Structures are given as structure tokens and as C-alpha cells.
Amino acid sequence: MGQIQYSEKYFDDTFEYRHVVLPPEVAKLLPKNRLLSENEWRAIGVQQSRGWVHYAVHRPEPHIMLFRRPLNYQQQQENQAQNMLVK
């Protein structure tokens, strides 16, 4: 069975992005014409930290999943957790 491949992260002014390349045997599990929820993409074996959203399908290559999350997402989560500990 092939391995799921993860790109390096890339950025714009608002989001950080990454793409995930699925092997054929996993790609065939993808539903047609819709995006996956976090629970769904985790269920097919995609592993990444919290906050990533499957935001687009690259029609010419549907085995490539496109993800994004807000810039500084992890830092915001750590700050919220720290604030809860202080209260």
C-alpha cells in the first residue's frame, strides 16, 4: 500500500496551506464533489495537527487534498489554553 505524502506548509497573508497526496487505494475512498470534515479525513488516514480544513478539490488531480488554516492557529490555541490555566 502506498504512503500518504504531505507537502511543506506555504503561506499567504491570511492562511497557511499544505497539500496531501493520497495513494490510489486511499484516493478511491474519497466522496465525489464534496469536501471532507476533519473526522472524515482522519478516518482515511490523514494525520496532521488540529485546525486544518479541507477547503478545495483540485479537479485535475482529485487524489490531492488541499488544506488551510488561519495563520498563527497553533499560537492562538496555546494562548487560549494558557489563559484557561490562569483563571
From Swiss-Prot:
GO terms for cellular component: cytoplasm; peroxisome. PROSITE patterns: CKS_1. The lineage of its organism: Eukaryota, Viridiplantae, Streptophyta, Embryophyta, Tracheophyta. Gene3D superfamilies: Cyclin-dependent kinase, regulatory subunit (3.30.170.10). The keyword Cell division applies. One of its GO terms (biological process) is DNA endoreduplication. Associates with cyclin-dependent kinases (CDKs) and plays an essential role in the regulation of the cell cycle that affects plant growth rate. May inhibit both the G1/S and G2/M phases. It comes from Arabidopsis thaliana. Plants overexpressing CKS1 show reduced leaf size and root growth rates resulting from an increase of the cell-cycle duration with an equal extension of both G1 and G2 phases and a shortening of the meristem. GO terms for molecular function: cyclin-dependent protein serine/threonine kinase regulator activity. Keywords: Cell cycle, Cell division. InterPro entries: Cyclin-dep_kinase_reg-sub, Cyclin-dep_kinase_reg-sub_sf. This is Cyclin-dependent kinases regulatory subunit 1. Belongs to the CKS family. Interacts with CDKA-1. Interacts with CDKB1-1, CDKB1-2 and CDKB2-1. Interacts with CYCD2-1 and At4g14310.
